[in-house]
Amino acid sequence: MVVILAIVEGITEFLPISSTGHMILVNKLIGGEYLSPTFRNSFLIIIQLGAIFSVVVYFWKDISPFVKTKKEFVLKFRLWLKIIVGVLPAMVIGLLLDDIIDKYFLDNVLIVAITLIAYGVIFIGIEVVYKLKNIKPKVKRFAGLKYRTAFLIGFFQCLAMIPGTSRSGATIIGALLLGLSRPLAAEFSFYLAIPTMFGATALKLFKNGLAFTEMEWSYLALGSAIAFVVAYIVIKWFMDFIKKRSFASFGLYRIILGIIVIVLLY
C-alpha cells in the first residue's frame, strides 16, 4: 500500500489533477486497515516531503540563494520575496482551518469527486475562452510578476485545502486568470509548493509525529523516497508538455475521473 500511494503521490502531486484526491481514492480502494487512522491521514500529507525535494533539486539553479554577482542576488531576492508573499494566505488560512478540514473534508470521497469535476470544467472553460478570444498572456517572466499578483495567486492556493481541488491546479488557474503564461504559471506553482508543503508537513509532524511507531516512520521514509524519484520525472515531463499544449486535457481527465468515482462509489 505504501509503495502504491508513494507512486500515486509522485505522479499526481504537481499535475493539476489533485494528488490528495487521488491518494484518498486509492486509500479507499486498496484498504490500509493495518495503519492507524491518525497515521493514514498524516501519511497523505507528510509523504509530500519527497515530492517537495524533487522541486528543489529540479529548479535548484533558478532558486538557489548561492550566487556570484550582485545582480543575481537581487533577482533571487525578489523571486523569493514574491514566493513568500504568495504563501502568506495559505499560511494564515491553513493554520486556522487545518483541524476543520481534517475533520469534515479529508476523507470525504464525494467532495473529492465534485471538486475534480468542477475544476476540470474551469480548466476547459479557461482554455476555450482564451482560444476563442485569442487572449495572450501579459506576464511571461518573473521580472514582470508583481507582488500584488503573487499575493492574489496565494489566495487561489488556499482553495486546495479542499481535497480534490489540486494545489497546483488552483494556483495555475489563478495565475492564468491574472495574466501569466502557462509555463510561468506552472513554474510559480512549483515554487509556491516549497514553503507551503514544507509547512503542511511540519504541522502534521508537530501534531502527530510523537504518536508514530518505528514501523510507521519507516513507511514515511520509504514513501517519501519513492515520491521524490517519481515526482522528479513527472516535473520534467510536465514542463515540456505545457510549452506545447494547453491544460484542457487535464480538465477532461478530472471530469472523467470525477464521474467514475461517483458511479463506482455511489
Curated annotation (Swiss-Prot):
UniProt KW Ion transport keyword: no
EC number of the protein: 3.6.1.27
Transmembrane region(s): 1-21, 43-63, 81-101, 109-129, 159-179, 183-203, 219-239, 246-266
Catalyzed chemical reaction(s): di-trans,octa-cis-undecaprenyl diphosphate + H2O = di-trans,octa-cis-undecaprenyl phosphate + phosphate + H(+)
Bilayer topology annotation: Multi-pass membrane protein
UniProt record, GO biological process: cell wall organization; peptidoglycan biosynthetic process; peptidoglycan metabolic process; regulation of cell shape; response to antibiotic
One example GO MF annotation: undecaprenyl-diphosphatase activity
Keyword match Ribosomal protein: no
Keywords, comma-separated and alphabetical: Antibiotic resistance, Cell inner membrane, Cell membrane, Cell shape, Cell wall biogenesis/degradation, Hydrolase, Membrane, Peptidoglycan synthesis, Transmembrane, Transmembrane helix
GO annotation, cellular component aspect: plasma membrane
Pfam families assigned to the protein according to its UniProt record, in alphabetical order: BacA (PF02673)
The organism's place on the tree of life at top rank: Bacteria
Chief localisation class: membrane
Principal EC category: hydrolase
Subcellular localization: Cell inner membrane
PANTHER family: UNDECAPRENYL-DIPHOSPHATASE (PTHR30622:SF3)
Family that this chain belongs to: Belongs to the UppP family.
Additional remark text: Bacitracin is thought to be involved in the inhibition of peptidoglycan synthesis by sequestering undecaprenyl diphosphate, thereby reducing the pool of lipid carrier available.
Function: Catalyzes the dephosphorylation of undecaprenyl diphosphate (UPP). Confers resistance to bacitracin.
Family matches, as HAMAP family: Undec_diphosphatase (MF_01006)
Protein name, per record: Undecaprenyl-diphosphatase
Organism: Fusobacterium nucleatum subsp. nucleatum (strain ATCC 25586 / DSM 15643 / BCRC 10681 / CIP 101130 / JCM 8532 / KCTC 2640 / LMG 13131 / VPI 4355)
